[in-house]
A protein has these predicted regions:
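Structural signature of Gram-negative outer-membrane beta-barrels, strongest in the C-terminal barrel
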Residues: 41-42, 86, 98-106, 110, ...
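Transmembrane beta-barrel strands of outer-membrane/channel proteins
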Residues: 39-45, 107-113, 155-159, 188-192, ...
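Gram-negative outer-membrane beta-barrel transporters
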Residues: 148, 247-250, 271-362
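Surface-exposed extracellular loop regions of Gram-negative outer-membrane beta-barrel proteins
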Residues: 2-5, 115-117, 163, 183-228, ...
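C-terminal beta-signal and adjacent terminal beta-strands/loops
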Residues: 343, 352-381, 396-402, 406-463
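Outer-membrane beta-barrel signature, preferentially recognizing the C-terminal barrel domain
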Residues: 7-30, 84, 132, 193-251, ...
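Repeated loop/turn-to-beta-strand initiation elements of outer-membrane beta-barrel proteins
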Residues: 33-37, 102-105, 150-153, 183-186, ...
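Face-selective signature of the C-terminal outer-membrane beta-barrel domain
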Residues: 1, 17-166, 179, 243, ...
């Protein structure tokens, strides 16, 4: 729970409650060294809710040290409540059989039953209430072949039945690994993958801490993608490897939020179907040089979605072909650890990536309607945003460096470790969001950053 505000800042009450629980039972049967049967039954329950209230003119009582905000249901100007419940019951069984040193076989089945409840209340009015019980029944077969020592084949498929879609879903896959020399592996693979749920997180949300999920609309094709991957891995020495991989993904079916759903039929109009394409290249270097170890990575990616957002049957290239929210063309990561001696060790983490995409504000408009009306003297006190291309702009590059020091100790007879860390060592201003003030003329925009330089410490011990 958080409550902030006072003086010229709106009063805000923010309550955030979440939790999950998992129960699992499994049984393994091994009749001989070549034969293994595994059976599992699990139940997972996940609940997340947010209660948000804002008062643009809070009653403040000032003191020398703080402002006390009087904010309650009667005085709040804006309220929002969200509740998301997910229950997942999963029963599955797999059978693995090693026929010989050159052939192994694996098969199995799965029954997954879900219960999904999602509800939104805005300004004390329920705007979204979706309840569903999707079920997926599937079976799979996978064969690994090693006809000669330098070549491996992996071939298989998964056959699924989704209770909200009439047709059976077939997902084939195949892969090959070739070792021309003992220290080099060349790899290629293809696979078709289906997903029966899609995320419904709002594009404008500030922090995507968790994903909210809903099943594919009734009688609609599940999300489907074909993955093509080619790569190589080279073992320089013990603990030192280099890998390079390139990929192309073609999505024949995806779902994105409908900007104008029909709230009388929210279940079937909450999302719009479309297509997408993604490609990229990834480089990874793992190092282990006595006292210095860690890894360095670089990735380039491009992800574009195509969705008929206005549902007119025509794709508008400028506004309906757009980057995904998580599209970051360039990403560099480094994680290094240096062992000074048996007691002390240093750590360094560096991240550089392209900024996250966002939908830009390109103008403002007077809000209409009784709720947005100001007063007789000043009727146009409320403004709304005019948005540009979805995810058409990008925040500045994200740069962050963290350092840490670990000290091993034996306190109270416990093997433990003291950990000290400085987050965002360079105090780089990484933009979290832009907030527009349309009451000014011309409108003004204020950038808000993520966390500044932060010092943390902790004590980790083993019992």
């Amino acid at each position: 729970f958080m409550s902030i505000g006072g003086e010229d800042f709106p009063g805000i009450d923010f309550a955030w409650d979440w939790g999950n629980s998992t129960k699992n039972i499994s049984w393994r049967y091994i009749p001989n060294s070549n034969y293994l049967i595994t059976t599992r039954l699990s139940k997972t329950k996940y609940n997340f809710n947010v209660d948000f209230e804002m008062d643009f003119n809070p009653d403040s009582v000032s003191s020398d040290t703080s402002d006390v905000i009087a904010l309650n249901e009667e005085s709040s100007d804006l309220s929002f409540f969200l509740d998301n419940l997910v229950e997942d019951i999963d029963l599955n069984q797999s059978i693995k059989y090693i026929l010989s040193d050159h052939v192994s076989f694996e098969s199995g089945w799965q029954i997954k039953t879900l219960k999904l409840d999602y509800r939104e209340i805005f300004a004390e009015q329920e705007v979204t209430n979706i309840n569903s019980k999707p079920q997926i029944i599937s079976t799979f077969v996978n064969v690994t072949l090693n006809p000669i020592p330098i070549i491996y084949y992996n071939i298989g498929f998964r056959l699924s039945k989704f209770n909200r879609y009439d047709d059976l879903i077939l997902n084939p896959k195949m892969g090959i690994k070739y070792n021309p020399i003992s220290d080099l592996a060349l790899k290629a693979s293809y696979g078709r993958y289906s997903q029966f749920l899609y995320t419904i997180n709002q594009e404008e949300e500030l922090l995507r801490i968790v994903d909210f999920w809903q099943p594919i609309p009734e009688d609609k094709k599940p999300q489907e993608a074909d993955h093509f991957i080619i790569g190589a891995e080279y073992w320089i020495s013990t603990g030192n490897t280099i890998s390079l991989e390139t990929y192309y993904k073609s999505y024949s079916s995806i779902y994105d939020l409908n900007p104008k759903p029909d709230y009388t039929d929210i279940q079937n109009t909450f999302a719009l179907s479309g297509t997408a394409k993604a490609y990229g290249i990834e480089f990874l270097y793992r190092m282990n040089r006595k006292k210095l170890n860690g890894w360095l990575s670089y990735a380039y990616s491009n992800i574009k979605r195509t969705v008929d957002l206005n549902s007119d049957g025509i794709i508008w290239d400028e506004k309906e072909i757009y980057p995904a929210k998580y599209d970051k063309p360039h990403s560099f990561n480094a994680l290094l650890s240096y062992q000074i001696n048996k007691k002390y060790s240093l750590g360094l983490t560096t991240v550089f990536s392209s900024g996250q995409t966002y939908t830009p504000v390109i103008g403002k408009v007077h809000q209409t309607g009784v709720e947005s009306y100001g007063s007789i003297e000043n009727p146009y006190t409320n403004f709304g945003n005019i948005y540009g291309i979805r995810n058409g702009s990008r925040y500045p590059n994200y740069i962050r460096t963290d350092i840490s020091l670990s000290i091993k100790s034996n306190l109270f007879g416990l093997d433990s470790e003291w950990k000290f860390q400085i987050i965002n060592l360079t105090n780089n201003y990484n933009v979290l969001l832009y907030l527009w003030d349309h009451t000014a003329s011309p409108s003004k925009v204020q950038a808000y950053s993520m966390f500044p330089r932060i010092f943390t410490f902790g004590w980790e011990f083993k019992i």
